Amino acid sequence: MKNFLPLLIIGLLFFGCISPSTPSIPLHLTNASLPATNSSQIQTINTTTTSIPVNSSNSSGISNVSSTNNNTSPTSQNTSAPVLIQLIIPASIESNCIGFLVGDSTELQNIPIAGGAWARPHPGPFAWGFIEKTPGIYDFSETDAWVISAQQSNVALLATIWPFADWDQTCKQNCEVDSSDQFYPKTKGGFTGGIPAKRCAPCNMTAYEHFIATLVERYDGDGVNDLPGLKLPINYYEILNEPAMDDKTLTFFKGTNMDYLELLKSSYEAIKSTCANCKIVQGGAAGIDFKFLSFWETFYSSGGSQYVDIANIHYIGNGDRDTLNVKKFKQTINNYGVNKPIWVTEAQYSSKDSITSSFEGSLDAGASRVFFVSFKIGEMNPPVFGEYSLEYQSLAAKCK
């Protein structure tokens, strides 16, 4: 009997009646595209046990959303919860209040040299019809190139969304701008620049909302369907530019202020549903002339502020130079109970005389970020790498 007990235990183990304890298994990252990050970019770690369908995509940036199989569960065979790391814009960039308009991604490398940390591509690559040329198929190759170039220069992007696709603009007439428009689309070397020619509000708002949610998801840095290698997310989106501008050679939007409010509402809700911490910037007010301010008075008196995180004013050499139009614009929106952060996303100077005083005046009046139109004050020529006005270098120290 003394020799029988060990044999009995061995037999039970062999037939599976008793199983040794299983060591705990550590959590693993399950999204193959999740990039390496450093501690300055980690904000939160979220865990989930639900499966996440992943759109089919490849390194070329082309994604066919219709090929997603929602019945396939990438994590269904794994009982451990995946860890998703949320990328954020580092504090060193967030605290910098200097940005520049750039027309080409090669200009991004000039921004840190000049003392800035932000870029507003203009008109930029974030146009619905240029990304989704065919309904349901997205080509992110151009936007990917911008994002990669920006993070290589350690520059954060303010992306301007152009909610226009020619194939969608079928429900209204007279949507196409004049061919003399400064941003009429032109194709060169296989690349189309400018802005889609038809510029009414989307006809199929559901399709537009799907586009913008897909775009935001690719660059939000949450580890789900992100651009492979993403390190610096896009957290700020401007919906259109100067929607009140209506000129033969410069029209950004064919619609009323109420049309813009509805468009902004749809954009805001689609972005927030995908990226709750993303911020929506109002399309820039073109100045403080009566026709521009009246557009925004109606917009804000009709409840537009609930779909805006950041208000936006421009100074293009006209108006109040001392505050870059911030003082008057702030007073105007305050009249309707609106108290939002204010950015100046276009500041243009003809000379160097007042750049420091007016920049400080804009901050004192309530601006929290200023984007300059050119690297060399008074010049609008394409910039040369390393060339900029020295006056810019001292401005970053004045950020509040």
Please report, for each region that a protein language model flagged, where it lies by residue.
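Extracellular mucin-like PTS domains
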Residues: S33, T37-T79
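Anion (oxyanion) recognition and catalysis
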Residues: Q151, K272, L363
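N-terminal substrate-binding region of glycoside hydrolase catalytic domains
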Residues: P82-I234, E238, A244, K248-L250
